[in-house]
Regions:
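Conserved N-terminal entry element of GNAT/NAT acetyltransferase domains
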Residues: 1-23, 156-176
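Conserved GNAT acetyl-CoA-binding A-motif
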Residues: 90, 116-131, 269-281
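Conserved catalytic-core motifs of GNAT/GCN5-like acyltransferases
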Residues: 125-128, 145-158, 297-310
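Amide-forming acyltransferase catalytic core, primarily the GNAT-like/NAT-type
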Residues: 141-241
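Conserved acetyl-CoA binding element of GNAT-fold acetyltransferases
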Residues: 86-98, 235-251
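Conserved beta-strand in the GNAT
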Residues: 66-68, 74-82, 89-94, 214, ...
Length: 325
């Protein structure tokens, strides 16, 4: 997602793009908040996202996939790429409002495209503002095409026991974690060839951002949900954010998806959180309808743009939560 209001024009700026360094993080975080807050018209733009954090968490997860743009030694923007196996997406791509429409965003997209090629990405994408033809026009120049809307949804957390058989990654003995990650990889690979959430599971565990909910039927893993919880994460105070969640496709998909949402809600209630937040692409029609029926309501919606212009895992019959922000 990129908060700019106009198509970028050719620029005579001397823009230097380089790896984002740890010493840049405070400035990059400020620019991210200021850019989004300005674009959506907040009275205090720098307060965008409150105590949630995207910049530091993503840099720590993979510093080699974070890029900085500077002009005359001044940091003016940043971009982050994320690798989920054969799936890749980028963002937040943010630029200081003083430098909008001057070619900075174009320069920040170039190293991301190179990374996707190095990674062997077969499906790449982004989430952006659905109402902005300017954003669509810019990204189309790089081969990304708009598809279905993604709804960012939330509901109050209800503290009730459902009898669902679930555990968390943090509860697993260290000796068992590699096998669990392999089982998660096998599950996601069954949804889209090469889809792999290992990096997200490990980032949440190492940075203590929340936990990964594991859904079981006996000894078979049937669902996973990578969750951020509370301040200093991508969730923010009082919130459990399901960054990724999925169950195996098939006849039991609907029932398993309901059980996975039960597990997420119970885990969040155990942490005394009050709000469950999750995104779903509306091309996953059954999952979207099921979340609405459960009481989720859309807070924000945007559009997914994909390269190549294919469905990937955004298709009917797939019970999966994510939003590519």
């Amino acid at each position: 997602m990129k908060p700019e209001s106009k198509i970028e024009e050719s620029s005579s700026l001397d823009i230097n793009v380089r790896p984002l360094q740890e010493s840049d993080l405070d400035a990059a975080d400020h620019i991210m908040r200021l850019a989004f807050g300005t674009f959506i018209g907040l009275p205090e733009p720098a307060q965008f996202m409150g105590d949630a954090d995207y910049v530091r968490t993503r840099w720590r997860a993979n510093p080699s996939a974070a890029f900085a743009a500077e002009v005359e030694g001044r940091l003016v923007g940043s971009n982050f790429a994320t690798r989920w196996g054969t799936v890749g997406f980028f963002g937040p791509l943010t630029i200081h409002p003083e430098f909008w429409d001057r070619g900075v965003g174009k320069r920040l997209m170039e190293p991301v495209g190179d990374l996707f090629a190095q990674w062997g990405t077969t499906h790449a994408g982004l989430f952006t503002f659905a109402h902005s033809q300017k954003h669509a026009g810019l990204y189309q120049k790089f081969g990304f095409w708009p598809r279905f809307l993604t709804a960012l949804m939330s509901k109050p957390i209800e503290n009730k026991s459902s009898g669902v058989e679930w555990s968390t990654f943090s509860q697993a003995p260290p000796a068992e974690r590699e096998n669990i990650i392999n089982a998660c990889r096998q599950l996601t690979d069954s949804i889209y060839k090469g889809l792999d959430l290992t990096s997200e599971i490990e980032a949440v565990a190492k940075q203590k951002l929340g936990d990964t909910v594991l859904l079981w039927k006996g000894d078979q893993l049937t669902g996973i949900a990578v969750c951020h919880c509370g301040p200093g994460t991508e969730a923010g105070s009082g919130t459990c954010y399901v960054k990724f969640g999925a169950v195996r496709s098939g006849e039991s998909g609907e029932a398993d998806f309901e059980r996975l949402l039960d597990g997420c809600e119970q885990m969040a209630a155990n942490r005394n959180l009050s709000r469950l937040f999750a995104g779903v692409n509306t091309a996953r029609h059954e999952a979207y309808r099921q979340m609405l029926a459960r009481g989720f309501r859309t807070d924000i919606q945007g559009v997914v743009m994909s390269k190549p212009n294919e469905a990937g895992y955004n298709r009917p019959g797939v019970y999966l939560i994510d939003d590519w922000r």
